[in-house]
A protein has these predicted regions:
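Alpha-helical transmembrane spans
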Residues: 8, 133, 137-139
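Acidic, serine/threonine-rich low-complexity disordered tracts
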Residues: 20-109, 139-226
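Hydrophobic, well-structured mid-protein blocks that either form specific transmembrane helices
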Residues: 93-133
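Sec-dependent N-terminal signal peptides
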Residues: 4-13
């Protein structure tokens, strides 16, 4: 039954895939809080700038994990995706993770019909079927692989429909669809493996919540969008 529901989900959204960026024309920003073990430790903000068929999505992320007052893990990142209509033209990011610099420089190669990537973990090309692994876009639920927005590495994934649910975020109830996003190869080391629960608000075409466990229980939750 789940396989049938999953097929119907992809069938429904495949007809709308060319209008993907149009779903976000109404947004100026999406604000997510980052929580670890129930405590707010940072934020993940997305800002949208539109000019005719051109859309720029700016991503700002920052969080830090402390233990007995000492910072044991921290990340600060800035990224920018550029689209013409529904086509990703370029993506660039710079990230500071535990005093280490990481980056991605991606651009569309029209001649070869692929992406050219130069990143801190991967340099080479990638199929246009890949998506940037950011939480603002529901296309991540339709893709077979994603490009890390921090390092440029390519990760194959499997998305499974769990069911329809109701969740409450900041005093407001939403009807959502619950998905599980995992690595295609689950034998990968845990720190390299994708293993996320995702709650998607179909009405607003918005991922409202993401949860995973790694050195604690993490949540990304949409606090505000406008």
């Amino acid at each position: 039954m789940k396989k049938i529901l999953l097929f119907l989900f992809f069938l429904t959204y495949s007809f709308n895939s060319t209008a993907h960026m149009a779903h976000y024309n109404k947004f100026n920003k999406i604000e997510m809080e980052i929580l670890r073990d129930g405590e707010v430790i940072g934020y993940n903000y997305y800002f949208f700038k539109k000019d005719s068929d051109n859309t720029t999505v700016t991503n700002q992320l920052k969080f830090s994990v402390k233990l007995f007052g000492a910072t044991i893990f921290e990340v600060e990142s800035f990224g920018e995706e550029k689209y013409i209509k529904d086509k990703l033209i370029s993506f660039n990011s710079k990230t500071r993770q535990n005093k280490k610099d990481k980056f991605v420089q991606l651009k569309l190669n029209d001649k070869e019909n692929e992406y050219d990537i130069k990143g801190s973990s991967y340099t080479g090309n990638a199929s246009l079927e890949n998506v940037i692994g950011n939480w603002w876009s529901h296309k991540i639920l339709q893709a077979n692989s994603q490009i890390s927005p921090i390092s440029g590495s390519i990760k194959e994934q499997v998305v499974t429909f769990i069911g329809k649910e109701k969740i409450v975020l900041y005093g407001k109830m939403y009807e959502v669809e619950h998905f599980k996003l995992t690595s295609k190869d689950m034998t990968l080391p845990k720190d390299k493996r994708l293993n996320f629960d995702i709650w998607f608000d179909k009405k607003n075409a918005l991922i409202l919540k993401v949860a995973y466990s790694r050195m604690g229980n993490w949540e990304y939750k949409v606090k505000n969008f406008e």
